[in-house]
Amino acid sequence: LAWLGIMPIDGEFRGVLQGEFGNSYGSVVKPVMEVIKEPMKTTVWINILATVLALGITIPLGIFCAVKKGSKRDTLIQVGSIIGYSLPTFIIAILFIFLFAILLPVFPVSGMNTPGSPYTGIMSILDRLYYMCLPLIVMTFCSLGGMTRFVRASMIEALSMDCIRTARAKGLKERTVIYSHAWRNALIPIVTLVIGWFLGIFSGSVMIEQMFEINGMGRVYIQALTSN
């Protein structure tokens, strides 16, 4: 650990398992938990929203592509998914900033709420959601490509199972076969993927948080790396 440069200054890890991470020796000496508490809340909040939005889009889209496998619409969605998956996050962010903040000035591009706003309660929540719209759109879009293809692959595998052929042979409606039988079998690997995503929530979205000036864990990482 000392060779990696991550050894604490006092050389001890006592208290880590109890959430006592010691002090942060930045411009001002503060307890680590005090430094990361608010950024952690922001990062978890925005990542959970982005995950929910992405799942709400990719699950029906992946099922549709699996059912319509080989069709023109499936091919079109797959091409779009590959393009979206291949583009770097900052390129997608720049494109959306140009589209929704410059060409069509709909959303703000930085901050988390209106500076000096007197909002409280529900208005404060709505104001923050308004400022989070563009980062959420970018994060959701960045997730669509990989997740859509994953759901599609899981559904195609489920639809080829013997139990699905048996269900169709019994004369069940196609909708029942897809959603009551195939989807249940395809759900297991998808749940595994989602759990992995939630574990990655705490790492923060470094690039997006930096570009949109969001006070999250991503910015904390950058500040820690660039501090003397």
Where in this protein do the model-derived segments appear?
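An internal, D/E-rich "acidic patch" concept
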Residues: 1-59
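Hydrophobic alpha-helical segments of integral membrane proteins
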Residues: 1-8, 21, 32, 36, ...
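Membrane-water interface segments at the C-terminal ends of transmembrane alpha-helices
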Residues: 2, 6-10, 80-111, 138-144
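Hydrophobic aliphatic residues
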Residues: 4-8, 12, 25, 100, ...
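Short helix-coil transition/hinge motifs at the ends and kinks of transmembrane helices
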Residues: 11-20, 25, 108-125
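Glycine-rich, flexible loop/turn motifs
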Residues: 17, 21, 103, 108, ...
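Phosphate-coordinating loops and pocket residues in cytosolic domains that bind phosphorylated ligands
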Residues: 26, 78, 109, 179
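Alpha-helical transmembrane segments of integral membrane proteins
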Residues: 40-44, 49-73, 89, 116-228
